[in-house]
């Protein structure tokens, strides 16, 4: 299924990472830029037609004309960012563009024409995020353009809504649960994240509790305290057979290697975070 075969019943799956990237771009925008826009990346399954928006990046632009109906994009920046993104994630393709605002902008037709060429295989999507927090919600909608007009007469585009779901993968669920706990029980140091190793400890404790529950269930079956359930038995069998048999010494070596990699990643990410904070403060000092 290509993007040109969209109908108003097509469903789009949006990864939460995209929302956070748009919010981050909006918070970091220049003072004279009221809204942000950028390129959407993702995949379209050929057989099922499942559309997933998995990534995005903002694009430098300038609005002009009456009611900001015209737009100039930094095409070199857009192409460079697209090349870098496809080096990291070659399976992701251009699906359309995002923008912030309360409604579809007057420049949407020009953007549609540009991203129609970028998509190569059909019609682009338009993700609109309302950052005004009306009703304490950040309303997010997906549009596709539908051609309107009469044969031989004036033609135009009408942006129609598509159904959309927020898709949470396993890593997304872990991150959202962590953020939920942080919101419910904020730390004294505002904005401070718990060390990643504490998340590993929490996950290990959770696995230990589930293993204890499984062991109690098996012991109750063996001691005839509870009736066996074939469905549960098959599920446990599938879980156990899916785990490869690894010697204790080899497992310890693998675990320690992964832990060293994690510590190295934490060190590098902390250095990058510090460098970004210094760069942002220096930039603010120059602007002031």
UniProtKB/Swiss-Prot annotation:
Entry GO terms, CC: eukaryotic 43S preinitiation complex; eukaryotic 48S preinitiation complex; eukaryotic translation initiation factor 3 complex, eIF3m
Places the protein is found: Cytoplasm
Pfam families: JAB, MitMem_reg
Disulfide bonding pattern of the chain: none
Gene3D superfamilies: Cytidine Deaminase, domain 2 (3.40.140.10)
MPN domain: residues covered: 12-149
Family statement drawn from the similarity comment of this UniProt entry: Belongs to the eIF-3 subunit F family.
Protein name: Eukaryotic translation initiation factor 3 subunit F-2
Species of origin: Drosophila pseudoobscura pseudoobscura (Fruit fly)
């Amino acid at each position: 299924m290509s993007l040109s075969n969209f109908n108003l019943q097509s469903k789009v799956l949006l990864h939460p990472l995209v929302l956070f990237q748009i919010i981050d771009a909006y918070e970091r925008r220049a003072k004279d830029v009221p809204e942000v826009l950028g390129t959407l990346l993702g995949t379209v399954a050929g057989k099922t037609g499942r559309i997933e928006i998995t990534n995005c990046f903002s694009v430098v632009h300038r609005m002009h004309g009456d009611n900001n109906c015209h737009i100039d994009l930094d095409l070199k920046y857009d192409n460079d960012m697209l090349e870098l993104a496809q080096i990291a994630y070659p399976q992701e393709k251009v699906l359309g563009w995002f923008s912030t605002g309360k409604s579809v902008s007057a420049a949407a037709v020009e953007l549609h024409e540009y991203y129609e060429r970028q998509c190569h295989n059909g019609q682009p999507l338009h993700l609109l995020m309302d950052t005004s927090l009306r009703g304490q919600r950040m309303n997010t909608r997906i549009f596709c353009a539908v051609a309107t007009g009469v044969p031989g007469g004036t033609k135009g585009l009408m942006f129609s809504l598509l159904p959309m779901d927020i898709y949470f993968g396993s890593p997304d669920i872990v991150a959202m649960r962590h953020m939920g706990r942080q919101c419910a029980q904020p730390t004294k140091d505002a904005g401070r994240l718990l060390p990643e190793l504490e998340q590993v400890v929490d996950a290990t404790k959770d696995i230990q509790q589930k293993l204890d529950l499984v062991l109690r269930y098996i012991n109750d079956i063996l001691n005839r305290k509870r009736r066996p359930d074939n469905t549960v038995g098959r599920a446990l069998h599938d879980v156990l057979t899916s785990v490869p048999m690894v010697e204790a010494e080899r497992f310890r070596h693998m675990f320690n290697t992964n832990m060293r990699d994690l510590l190295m990643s934490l060190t590098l990410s902390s250095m990058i975070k510090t460098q970004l904070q210094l760069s942002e403060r220096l930039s603010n000092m120059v602007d002031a």
